Design a protein with these regions (language model features):
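Non-catalytic structural scaffold of enzyme domains
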Residues: 1-312
Length: 312
């Protein structure tokens, strides 16, 4: 990883199974220019969604998820020659190690799961009596990646509560602040609180799907309505790229010139661009503009996906 800092110019590829990881790309675009760590940095957001009528969490098996993501990873390396790949997606991070790509690539690849685990562990250390509620997709919860890593670090499994939030990422993409998204989040918060063993004990929450951070205010409001106005809610997204901002290399150059590109195999609807673009623009106007002018490439990668099974 230290070899990255020997480079004057760098290509950072951020990928996600949807558009949640745009916030990670935006954070990089916002922080890099003044850092002066590199002379030039190209940031590519690669949407790894393989079909507009499906998604990784709807695939019938883990093997199929691994197969398709592996094809996407190969395309990332072959088409963009990144110096590093950031998997800004918990669903894809938890299956990455199973891909053939992971076993042969020389490109450093970092997933967001460990970032989330570090932040949850930090909160446990600050409040040992608390329980953690992990909001994530079905795939992320089923693998128990966060929970198992925390247990290995010595934290009690009874204090780690996982809640799968089916379809929430899709609702957020359509409207992070919409009435439907707000209602769905409120329902999931209610379900999570019902799973706590000791209702009177302190709790904190962690948003372990990169989409969920877009609706942070809705989560806060839902917890407030449920009687937890001061709850700590963790969003790993802004922390994922911290490792790049090594103090040892800050101001190697007077500034870092950046370029941001967004590429997608599937079309991104105007509604999604409008919804998420406003939120991304608050972090990085350049990333919001790149999203608006994204490159639609139906041949970005060939997932060999049988769409007949979803009626298309």
């Amino acid at each position: 990883m230290n070899n990255l800092f020997d480079k004057n110019e760098i290509t950072i590829l951020v990928t996600d199974s949807g558009l949640g990881g745009l916030s990670v790309a935006a954070d990089l675009a916002a922080r890099l220019p003044k850092s002066g760590i590199f002379e030039k940095a190209r940031i590519i957001f690669f949407n790894a969604l393989f079909h507009p009528g499906s998604g990784y969490n709807f695939l019938p098996s883990e093997e199929e998820k691994v197969r398709i993501f592996n094809i996407a990873l190969q395309a990332m390396e072959e088409k963009y020659h990144p110096d590093i790949i950031l998997i800004a997606c918990n669903t894809l991070s938890v299956i990455y190690d199973q891909t053939p790509f992971a076993k042969k690539t020389k490109v450093p690849v970092l997933g967001i799961v460990e970032t989330g685990v570090d932040l949850i562990a930090e909160q446990f250390d600050n409040n040992p009596d608390a329980s953690a509620i992990i909001f994530a997709t079905q795939t992320t919860i089923e693998t128990n990646s966060h929970k198992n890593m925390l247990i290995k670090r010595g934290y009690e499994k009874e204090k780690i509560i996982g809640l799968p939030c089916s379809m929430l990422a899709d609702y957020i993409e359509e409207g992070a602040n919409s009435e439907m998204t707000t209602l769905v989040i409120s329902e999931y918060v209610s379900q999570a609180l019902e799973k706590t063993n000791k209702p009177s004990a302190p709790i904190f929450a962690s948003l372990n799907c990169t989409h969920y951070g877009y609706s942070m205010e809705q989560f806060k409001a839902a917890f407030k309505d449920a009687g937890y106005p001061d709850i700590k809610i963790i969003n790993p997204n802004p922390e994922m790229s911290n490792f790049l901002f090594n103090k040892k290399y800050i101001n190697r150059y007077s500034e870092t010139e950046i370029n941001v590109d967004v590429v997608s195999k599937t079309k991104i609807t105007e509604a999604k661009i409008a919804s998420l673009g406003k939120l991304v623009e608050k972090i990085s106007p350049q990333t919001a503009e790149a999203t608006k002018n994204y490159k639609y490439d139906p041949d970005l990668f060939d997932a060999k996906f049988d769409s007949s099974r979803i009626g298309l």
